[in-house]
């Protein structure tokens, strides 16, 4: 059943689908010419989750069965029921029970992951039936590394699904042996030492799970390391580490135990009672207990693994750091936070749109975007002036003169992110949107506050707290500080023309800076504006002539400074910054073309003949010996046969015009024509054999066919093919890619990567979209229902429309030119795109695809911005199973995917089907996408009850009923539209276009900038930053490189062959004369040594760290310095 939509939304979907069908028609016509591995387009379209699962699993009739189950039960329950039905033979046909059980478990995982990720195929390598010691049959599930892409819940429920299938098919529980238990313990701890786990289980937790789990959690080897203790076990097939079992047990069953328990209880399963012990032994998701929360305990986890060149912007909860503000702008939410663009600029451009910050709370990380309706930073200049910055221009102007950044400004985080992370609220500051609701409770009159006098008058008249705009950071002072400041001003200050003038005195100056009061310093005198003078005197209980109104009032004041100020000024003064958010830089934003390593134009093998560059031109001129034919090379490719003329070849298209088919055979027995296992030796058959290819002739013919000359620098192929049938791509495609300077990916497509940023509303002006073009795209009205007439109106973004970077447009223009040439010159069809400038790309369709997934999402380009990021609706990102905490995805032109993608090019190895568009989602159904998007709040303002709840440290779920969330709109037309936001922003691409981390040159430059910024930030301890950089980045690097140098291989510069030790001849025996060189050089080992010692001494890191560096320096010197021959000069003997 299609999702409910309004007429306008339905018209939008139909418009996208009509254009898709037009594209597919053209691609199908091209494919039918027989020049590609398949005569059909190889990306099937899917309308819903059920369709996607059926395509991925390849079981006819599965989609209808899934839809039937989902009508009656939840997603999780439906996944289990479908699995049971497959295992019992109600859906699909299989050769034996084992295959049916395997399909059942994989299908359950596919349903749980919305049919988007590759985990069902790649993460579950096999499901087998095996025997217990008592002869009963149990189920064994083999997990592989890609199961991680399914997420913890799906990992855990895959085990539950296998148990459900076991029960339905009458099989016994797994009965583990004691040695196997201890093997699990050793193996998971070994995996933790070589790879990352979100949670490290205790030995007892591991033993509890594996002793009681009713199915066997097994896996294929994923690491080279082997266990040392429990080796060569009868029922364990490998001694190598199996990463899949560690992921499923640690990140799946243990971390998601409460969710698994909920389903176990609902299904009334016995044998899972041990989950209660796991739940009791694990920490609650929120992290802190109530007493700790009420103190807002700082969390320093985000500072772990600090990297050189990526600054810390605030230590945990430290004054001067980012001030939390609750709300959602049109470009925040879904794990994205916003700060003022002036904050980005004043921090030396290290933060740009899309830059990832590791944050203290509520989650682990967030992408950053500009929101100029927030408060900007406050800085102190070298001349002592304090400036509150509210725009980028001012930030750029004063940046060279800043001596300290006193306050980073505000950071906006939405309610939905706290709900998603189940993080207990931290207190909200008293903000304007709260003050307005306080005032509305007192009067229905329209009240304007344009001066401090009016602000105090309104507070006195209506009994509301002082307006936040006129409230200083009193909570950062002690009551003693307040009393001292009042007495100092009364005794030493004077007022001229309404401006307070104070002699510069260290403590009072420092207190005024902590309060973030703008000030000037002239002739050793601090000068405050008339407005700030009025506010400060009122708050300190001083008369206009600076005399104390009531000298006795300063005795017995409340210990909280802001409460003490309330008592002195006679109106309630609220806390402006009860919570600060610590942060450091994570990944820089990304907007870059996707390349294989090394970059490739065509998936055509050139072997050693192509040299280090894999050049087709070099291969065309290659001759192994004087007697060999020039341009003839020997490479491994698949044998194919033309059904029309019977000719054997390696190409997809036969010279006679026929479309060839692969011919499988046994390499040992010589039997051919049988796919599967050889009937004689029982080894797998393969079409792949070494064959001689006339590259020179092929290349010349391909150039002639597409009407091009060999005038490009290099046409790059691959050294060898790694697909199952080793099918080469037509050279003509590579020639046209080289002409247009675009590069192919492993599946035949051309991609462009960008950081994910959410957007629910846009202004046509900011994305370069004219009003006429916007209307043409279907944007007839703005978000408030008014006809669209101005490029400054705010429009609500359709769920499958995307906005790309200008850099992306430059590359996609080249891609479109390549595709038009391909259609015209290779397929003999009319050009399709005919684009010449950026604006021509608007309205064209793309495929969005995330790494580790196998389902693309249909999208439409509607504009471009200067930021290095890709903007799309949160639903678009969620449909790819991504959020926006710094993730990056790719786009490809739709025609490119339909024309050039082929399963025949995908690597034949674990993970080969990941990051490939095996299916295309045509229409986003909010009910079928990642549930994190359901927690996005879509209201114009948060109610007062929300702010009060934050002050009481309540859980986000306690206020869910009063918040307007996407989850409450599911199943209605409002699930797509009518979204609102609490805070506006004038330009989604404001601030720096790129992070300074990307624009600075060497690592030394980046490190210097990082530490210099740390010196200026009030919220940062630069000594701690220096120590963390040395301990978490430089020391491990130095030690690792030193180890790598001593165990390195040698490499031939000519053919690339590697050797464990240098050949005695000094040249490469394989290619006969290539120079053999080191793969790890002295410079790689010593590159961080000097800079580490320099910053260790400059920043006064602990002596233990300095001693570690000095010992390492001695080790490096002993390795590289020659003690026997030392250059001496005359001065050495004087």
From Swiss-Prot:
Keywords: DNA replication, DNA-binding, DNA-directed DNA polymerase, Exonuclease, Hydrolase, Multifunctional enzyme, Nuclease, Nucleotidyltransferase, Transferase. InterPro entries: PolC_DP2, PolC_DP2_cat_dom, PolC_DP2_central_dom, PolC_DP2_N. GO terms for molecular function: DNA binding; DNA-directed DNA polymerase activity; single-stranded DNA 3'-5' DNA exonuclease activity. It catalyses: DNA(n) + a 2'-deoxyribonucleoside 5'-triphosphate = DNA(n+1) + diphosphate; Exonucleolytic cleavage in the 3'- to 5'-direction to yield nucleoside 5'-phosphates. Disulfide bonds: none annotated. Its EC number is 2.7.7.7, 3.1.11.1. The keyword DNA-binding applies. One of its GO terms (biological process) is DNA-templated DNA replication. Heterodimer of a large subunit and a small subunit. Belongs to the archaeal DNA polymerase II family. HAMAP family: DNApol_II_L_arch. NCBIfam families: polC, PRK04023.1. Possesses two activities: a DNA synthesis (polymerase) and an exonucleolytic activity that degrades single-stranded DNA in the 3'- to 5'-direction. Has a template-primer preference which is characteristic of a replicative DNA polymerase. This is DNA polymerase II large subunit. It comes from Methanocella arvoryzae (strain DSM 22066 / NBRC 105507 / MRE50). The gene is polC.
